[in-house]
């Protein structure tokens, strides 16, 4: 079991700022560096993964599109969505990539169960679904044995921009969110529950709250 998983709550932050910072963090970390999770929300943005195809961007309109280095296709981030960037030494943890993906999916399924929402993963389409509608997405990159990028859980947000794309490359894929499934919820409580479930499902002994921003990685 790993020792401590540190969490930084960064609030609303520009996508590209977070992306460049997580790449630099991963490139500069040493073998003894502690693992971190950055909890954020983003202003509206579409991100196109390495497998992304232009035809899945239907009508982006005035929402920016950023080509990124994670796996997967196009998705949307916006306020009211809880994003967790997972900077983990996967090699040290002893996880394979498929194992890591399964653990993240199980984390989200357990979190949703805390709210009485029955969710499931799909073997052929990474993410978490409620009655066939996608409630959480994930996309990772592994570099030098360490992960970055992570997961995005729709908590209480405007889902309309998802209709401007084929989410994750699937035409007509329905999207849902926790507030539609469980009623009124506190975003901060969801974040706290996600922290606890990540610690449990990634086999850490405890969690720690990290202070300070990420400007030195930007």
From Swiss-Prot:
Residues 31-206 form the BPL/LPL catalytic domain. Pathway: Protein modification; protein lipoylation via endogenous pathway; protein N(6)-(lipoyl)lysine from octanoyl-[acyl-carrier-protein]: step 1/2. It catalyses: octanoyl-[ACP] + L-lysyl-[protein] = N(6)-octanoyl-L-lysyl-[protein] + holo-[ACP] + H(+). Pfam families: LplA-B_cat (PF21948). It is found in: Cytoplasm. GO terms for cellular component: cytoplasm. The record marks 134 as: Lowers pKa of active site Cys. Its EC number is 2.3.1.181. Catalyzes the transfer of endogenously produced octanoic acid from octanoyl-acyl-carrier-protein onto the lipoyl domains of lipoate-dependent enzymes. Lipoyl-ACP can also act as a substrate although octanoyl-ACP is likely to be the physiological substrate. This is Octanoyltransferase. It comes from Pseudomonas syringae pv. syringae (strain B728a).
């Amino acid at each position: 079991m790993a020792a401590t998983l540190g969490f930084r709550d960064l609030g609303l932050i520009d996508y590209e700022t977070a992306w460049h910072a997580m790449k630099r963090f991963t490139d500069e970390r040493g073998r003894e560096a502690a693992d971190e999770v950055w909890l954020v929300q983003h202003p509206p943005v579409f991100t196109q993964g390495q497998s992304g195809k232009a035809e899945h961007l239907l009508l982006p309109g005035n929402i920016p599109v950023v080509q990124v280095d994670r796996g997967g296709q196009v998705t949307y981030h916006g306020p009211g969505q809880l994003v967790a960037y997972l900077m983990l030494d996967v090699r040290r943890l002893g996880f394979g990539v498929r194992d890591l993906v399964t653990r993240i999916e199980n984390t989200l399924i357990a979190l949703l169960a805390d709210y009485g929402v029955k969710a499931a993963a799909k073997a052929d389409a990474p993410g978490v679904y409620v009655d066939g509608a996608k409630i959480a997405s994930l996309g990772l990159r592994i570099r030098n044995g360490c992960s970055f990028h992570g997961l995005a859980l729709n908590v209480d947000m405007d889902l309309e921009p998802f209709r401007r794309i084929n989410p994750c490359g699937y035409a007509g894929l329905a999207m849902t969110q926790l507030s539609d499934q469980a009623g009124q919820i506190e975003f901060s409580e969801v974040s706290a529950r996600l922290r606890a479930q990540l610690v449990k499902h990634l086999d850490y002994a405890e969690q720690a709250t990290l202070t300070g921003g990420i400007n030195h990685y930007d």
